[in-house]
């Protein structure tokens, strides 16, 4: 079996940075314990990234995943997830007498601050994203009242837009660029003028999606590896499938539909921004063995 592997597959800068920050806290805690000091409790606030194998590995190291601010105890070392958190939660965390380490992706942090600046200037946010995604909840916390979220042009068409309101358009950092541009064009037609755009889709997302499209057009099937909770991985599968090729999204090689793939001559392989290289490697080896 021939496999074309995407060069962009695997950890993005934001994920790598977040994991390095968490690793640093784990290492420091172990060093202190080795010196006879009490081992401080290490935790993340929410899953550090959306990958089950990575989360399981950290749990094995004693890293807890906290969901509520009142779970944080004095002296804890708490690492904020790569997706960011609502600013009210961040303020509450910092009031708990704990050591708080912000591992928010720099691209997400830039989007948060850009949204805040636009809203302070009197504009209202139209946000293209998944309403229940943790990154989106964080972004909305910087937008004030009146912000609207939509996940597709169909949803955008159903929003109660007011002609007299000065809107601006932004997106979840891992959203589909083509769909975002379609929303932008629809707004121009609907409102009769160009809506200001805050460019928040990161380059890594754009390049990863474009490479997935390019590979999907050359192969008999496409395999996308990454957590089922990972929005950017789901969108990779979507853009690949949109090219008309059989596409499967799996978390690891054990979930591959072997019989459906066995007859393929060439298979494309890509992975989400939170998928470890070891899992991508294992999936590639398995595919090549078919």
Curated annotation (Swiss-Prot):
Binding locations of (2E)-4-hydroxy-3-methylbut-2-enyl diphosphate: 50, 83, 133, 173, 230, 232, 274
Binding site for dimethylallyl diphosphate: 50, 83, 133, 230, 232, 274
Reaction(s) the record says it catalyses: isopentenyl diphosphate + 2 oxidized [2Fe-2S]-[ferredoxin] + H2O = (2E)-4-hydroxy-3-methylbut-2-enyl diphosphate + 2 reduced [2Fe-2S]-[ferredoxin] + 2 H(+); dimethylallyl diphosphate + 2 oxidized [2Fe-2S]-[ferredoxin] + H2O = (2E)-4-hydroxy-3-methylbut-2-enyl diphosphate + 2 reduced [2Fe-2S]-[ferredoxin] + 2 H(+)
A biological process term (GO) from this entry: terpenoid biosynthetic process
GO MF assignments: 4 iron, 4 sulfur cluster binding; 4-hydroxy-3-methylbut-2-enyl diphosphate reductase activity; metal ion binding
Highest rank taxon of the organism: Bacteria
Residues that hold [4Fe-4S] cluster according to the record: 12, 105, 202
Pfam families documented for this protein: LYTB
Binding site for isopentenyl diphosphate: 50, 83, 133, 230, 232, 274
Enzyme superclass (EC): oxidoreductase
Entry keywords, A to Z: 4Fe-4S, Iron, Iron-sulfur, Isoprene biosynthesis, Metal-binding, Oxidoreductase
Required co-factors: [4Fe-4S] cluster
The keyword Iron belongs to this UniProt entry's keyword annotation: yes
EC number: 1.17.7.4
Keyword Glycosyltransferase annotated: no
Cofactor note: Binds 1 [4Fe-4S] cluster per subunit.
Pathway assignment: Isoprenoid biosynthesis; dimethylallyl diphosphate biosynthesis; dimethylallyl diphosphate from (2E)-4-hydroxy-3-methylbutenyl diphosphate: step 1/1; Isoprenoid biosynthesis; isopentenyl diphosphate biosynthesis via DXP pathway; isopentenyl diphosphate from 1-deoxy-D-xylulose 5-phosphate: step 6/6
Active site (catalytic residues): 135
Family according to the record: Belongs to the IspH family.
Function: Catalyzes the conversion of 1-hydroxy-2-methyl-2-(E)-butenyl 4-diphosphate (HMBPP) into a mixture of isopentenyl diphosphate (IPP) and dimethylallyl diphosphate (DMAPP). Acts in the terminal step of the DOXP/MEP pathway for isoprenoid precursor biosynthesis.
Protein name (database record): 4-hydroxy-3-methylbut-2-enyl diphosphate reductase
Name of the encoding gene: ispH
């Amino acid at each position: 079996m021939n496999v074309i592997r995407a060069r962009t597959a695997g950890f993005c800068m934001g994920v790598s940075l977040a994991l390095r920050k968490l690793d640093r806290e784990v290492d420091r805690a172990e060093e202190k314990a080795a010196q006879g000091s009490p081992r401080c409790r290490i935790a993340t606030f929410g899953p550090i990234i959306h990958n089950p194998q990575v989360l399981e590995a950290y749990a094995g190291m004693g890293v807890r995943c906290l969901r509520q601010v009142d779970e944080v105890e004095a002296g804890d070392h708490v690492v904020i997830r790569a997706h960011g958190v609502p600013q009210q939660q961040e303020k509450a965390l910092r009031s708990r007498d704990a050591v708080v380490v912000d591992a928010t992706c720099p691209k997400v942090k830039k989007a948060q601050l850009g949204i805040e600046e636009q809203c302070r200037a009197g504009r209202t946010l139209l946000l293209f994203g998944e309403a229940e995604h943790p990154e989106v909840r964080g972004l909305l916390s910087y937008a004030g009242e009146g912000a609207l979220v939509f996940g597709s042009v169909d949803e955008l068409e159903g929003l109660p837009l007011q002609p007299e309101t000065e809107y601006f358009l932004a997106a979840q950092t891992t959203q589909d660029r083509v769909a975002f541009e379609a929303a932008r064009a629809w707004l121009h037609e609907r409102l009769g003028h160009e809506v200001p755009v805050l460019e928040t889709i990161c380059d890594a997302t754009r390049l990863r999606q474009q490479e997935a499209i390019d590979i999907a057009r050359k192969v008999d099937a496409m395999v996308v590896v990454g957590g089922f909770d990972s929005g950017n991985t789901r969108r990779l599968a979507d853009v690949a499938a949109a090219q008309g090729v059989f596409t499967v999204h799996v978390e690891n090689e054990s979930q591959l539909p072997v019989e459906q793939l066995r007859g393929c001559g060439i298979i494309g392989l890509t992975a989400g921004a939170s998928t470890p290289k070891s899992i991508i490697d294992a999936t590639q080896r398995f595919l090549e063995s078919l």
